[in-house]
Amino acid sequence: MSLRAVWHLGLLGSLVGAVLAATHRGPAANTTDPLTHAPVSPHPSPLGGFAVPLVVGGLCAVVLGAACLLELLRRTCRGWGRYHPYMDPVVV
């Protein structure tokens, strides 16, 4: 995989994870009945039954993005090490 593809996958994974995390809404903050002031159960997620798969998918996208960005960092540092005057040459 080329360095550019790794870079784009890393950015895409990070952005998808951030968007999914930002769009997920938890239970409602006000959980009391306005008339009786009795506690009520929170409203279901506005995403319905898809909330858990979206969160898991977002976490997977974040992990993919982090792995790609770490691979990019590893390749970049290896490339810099080849030209450092005080280091032995790196055999690839």
UniProtKB/Swiss-Prot annotation:
Keyword Protein transport tagged: no
Listed InterPro entries: Herpes_gJ
Membrane topology (UniProt): Single-pass type I membrane protein
Subcellular location: Host Golgi apparatus membrane; Host endoplasmic reticulum membrane; Host endosome membrane
UniProt cross-references to Pfam families, sorted A to Z: Alpha_GJ
Keywords on record: Glycoprotein, Host endoplasmic reticulum, Host endosome, Host Golgi apparatus, Host membrane, Membrane, Signal, Transmembrane, Transmembrane helix
Signal peptide: 1-21
Extracellular side: 22-49
Residue stretches spanning the membrane: 50-70
Paired cysteines (S-S): none
Glycosylation sites: 30
Residues in compartment: Cytoplasmic: 71-92
Gene Ontology CC entries for this record: host cell endoplasmic reticulum membrane; host cell endosome membrane; host cell Golgi membrane; membrane
Keyword Ribonucleoprotein assigned: no
Functional description taken from the UniProt entry: Inhibits host cell apoptosis. Induces an increase in reactive oxygen species (ROS) in the host cell.
Family to which this protein belongs: Belongs to the alphaherpesvirinae glycoprotein J family.
Protein name in the entry: Envelope glycoprotein J
Gene transcribed to yield this protein: gJ
